[in-house]
Amino acid sequence: MFNLKVKDLNGSARGLTQAFAIGELKNQLSVGALQLPLQFTRTFSASMTSELLWEVGKGNIDPVMYARLFFQYAQAGGALSVDELVNQFTEYHQSTACNPEIWRKLTAYITGSSNRAIKADAVGKVPPTAILEQLRTLAPSEHELFHHITTDFVCHVLSPLGFILPDAAYVYRVGRTATYPNFYALVDCVRASDLRRMLTALSSVDSKMLQATFKAKGALAPALISQHLANAATTAFERSRGNFDANAVVSSVLTILGRLWSPSTPKELDPSARLRNTNGIDQLRSNLALFIAYQDMVKQRGRAEVIFSDEELSSTIIPWFIEAMSEVSPFKLRPINETTSYIGQTSAIDHMGQPSHVVVYEDWQFAKEITAFTPVKLANNSNQRFLDVEPGISDRMSATLAPIGNTFAVSAFVKNRTAVYEAVSQRGTVNSNGAEMTLGFPSVVERDYALDRDPMVAIAALRTGIVDESLEARASNDLKRSMFNYYAAVMHYAVAHNPEVVVSEHQGVAAEQGSLYLVWNVRTELRIPVGYNAIEGGSIRTPEPLEAIAYNKPIQPSEVLQAKVLDLANHTTSIHIWPWHEASTEFAYEDAYSVTIRNKRYTAEVKEFELLGLGQRRERVRILKPTVAHAIIQMWYSWFVEDDRTLAAARRTSRDDAEKLAIDGRRMQNAVTLLRKIEMIGTTGIGASAVHLAQSRIVDQMAGRGLIDDSSDLHVGINRHRIRIWAGLAVLQMMGLLSRSEAEALTKVLGDSNALGMVVATTDIDPSL
């Protein structure tokens, strides 16, 4: 499906191997770093750049090809000094002296503007700072929409970037749908639930090594500080297998932060000026509470490695650490008292002038994952698909609603009331003003449970799998009973700590097939984010797959629902629903990947059932296929195609070579940005499984022809960009976000622009393949 040639890449760019950069988001939120091979030192880079600039000056190299090389440099952002690049770009007088027209074309292609006001013979006099600003605009920051399509994709996309802890005991999962085209509202879930676990993981981290890492990454955005802390915590967690010394953790954190940002830090340990001058670090340095406390501890006890009680750890150290790390984030942090609590960690973000309320909580019982829930509301009388109104619901109210989904391992709340009530065996009423509701939550128990002891004891017991004597005596080996006890305890604790919400006595309501469900009467002075088209969501999972539950009947918020009851006898842990309207069990996508290696054609087919057999559940493919996500991808796809068509038309009517090159540069930038996003999708979740299967089969074919050893996948690995792009397109088709015809049209446009060649120009792909 996606077959682009790499042969035509300019050979002079082969030295720039393994350079991978994806630019920066706004507010110094770095999402990538430049990875340089061992042989690619700055000395080599400078000599190569000088040689190529000399050739450009003599007119021997296509300025477009060399401009693409500069474009890759510019995308690196702070990882590779843009100032240094611009200095080299402007100081070589041979270029302007020998061929000013080539220089003008080169500048036009890089900046995307021919700038007719500057004459060709005066290009060399352009101030370096002006070109610097133009180069910085190349970092693709406007189209980060794939961070916001689905909760599943966000989880996998953020993991390799360090915003979440990959492969740890639990996974951060965040759901956020932004209003088009404001795709910058990344939820600050880096410091979500159970920070103590992350802190304890730092106990075995070599602080000197971490210091050296911070110092080496000094040119990067300050958000990488929390990224490295998270990565270090993950490494330490795997290394120590859960055996932590909390006191050593606190000492390590304070030592690291104190040495890095204390006013008394030796100059040689101080971060670079670039890092120090950013807003995040300025705020962090001004947070003297952490540093004063650190210095006082050293002064009083003579050393940083001190002993802290649990009370000190929970009431003083962790809040200090959270407060310090919050200054690195471009978003406002949750209140400390809510962040360190067990239930209802919330964040109030003022994004683009609009309030955005997020609740983050840990799914304790079934899956160690973090869920972020953003209440959103559409205009009921509008056909628009984008979320342009968010109700002003308080953090406390969101915190109270969170355990509702928490009980049944809900990754996020489902599409609308209809799905919840019909699929989850419950009933409910929401009055017309949206300020009062009666919700029926499923329980799968046969008798009521009285809260005759501390609810947190029950929660702790169920979290750890330890059932005390009283609970065991009441319901021996009764998993349903335990789940209900846990549910009741969580709800009781949540509402008891929230004066804004009043919950009546719960009661068991008989239902069909021996199942029961609870009824809670919840009322508040605030608007409740429940109702038709009011909540966008995710999935409720079960250990074994069930058939889809279709729902497509629009329900008005004022209606009273009596839901159908599911047979829960064989599903004791959670309920499974399909959170989308089109509930068909089949979908078509391009399942064949083809590639030419050494003039031989190889094709690998990847079927749906094979992907599911690898543990990739179908709902992980089709999770959250609401009209919102589909509308976003459609609008984004339309933007790319329409913009490319407009630029192509403008190029046909232009008579100025520099202006044509400027248009080519803009088209290339758009295409490269698009390809990187598609490739990113191809590296996540089910896309990675598709890549693995296709690679394995191509290896088998090559081995069968005697071209490689059975255990070698060398020749497949070098085509990783192409196969990841194919997988990304296939996943988008599986989700229904792109049709097969749209994907084919997209590949044609990208092929015409040679965007794939641009993506691989700075990697180790052999152009001879």
From Swiss-Prot:
Molecular function per GO: identical protein binding; RNA binding
InterPro entries on file: P1
Highest taxon above the source species: Viruses
Source lineage: Viruses, Riboviria, Orthornavirae, Duplornaviricota, Vidaverviricetes
Entry GO terms, CC: T=2 icosahedral viral capsid; viral inner capsid; viral nucleocapsid
Organism: Pseudomonas phage phi6 (Bacteriophage phi-6)
NAD found in the keyword field: no
Function: P1 is the major inner capsid (core) protein of the polyhedral procapsid, which is responsible for genomic replication and transcription. Forms a dodecahedral shell from 60 asymmetric dimers. Binds to RNA and may be involved in genomic packaging.
Subcellular location: Virion
UniProtKB keywords: Capsid protein, Inner capsid protein, RNA-binding, T=2 icosahedral capsid protein, Transcription, Viral nucleoprotein, Virion
Protein name per its UniProtKB record: Major inner protein P1
Subunit structure and binding partners: Homodimer. Associates with the polymerase complex.
Keyword Membrane: no
